[in-house]
């Protein structure tokens, strides 16, 4: 079994959502952790648990971030974490249970395994994954929206995300 050490400094979670039917708002979560277990030589053996702290949301606008922390969206006073627990990983996809605001649904996302490399700064082996996909926020009770007088709604229901996770490897 390979020992993986999560490297948050070289990892991130970014998202975007349609805004006013004409543009998009982007953001990130600053606090998260990924536990990874299994054999790096057998991707199907890997099991991961990602924990995201929704109160760490950052869209570069404090008023918007505070609204996103409110009960209209993440309700961070009552919901201090979101989790994704894998059930199956292969070279192209990851299937797992995503929990947001106490709602759990199985989701399938794209995954890109970036191989193993040696860090020239410290000689340590590292590996990384990029996971991306689309989440229907309404499935998780995040329903806030407003109708526009020109038609359509203020916010899209689908949130696109990309998460990049890097790990050092101890053999």
UniProtKB/Swiss-Prot annotation:
InterPro entries attached to this UniProt entry? Lipid/polyisoprenoid-bd_YceI, TTHA0802/YceI-like_sf
Known SMART domains for this protein? YceI
- Note the superkingdom of the native organism: Bacteria
What lineage is on file?
Bacteria, Bacillati, Bacillota, Bacilli, Bacillales
Q: Which Gene3D superfamilies match?
A: Lipid/polyisoprenoid-binding, YceI-like
Please give the name of this protein: UPF0312 protein SERP2314
Please provide an example of a Pfam family that matches this protein in its UniProt record: YceI
Q: What family does the entry list?
A: Belongs to the UPF0312 family.
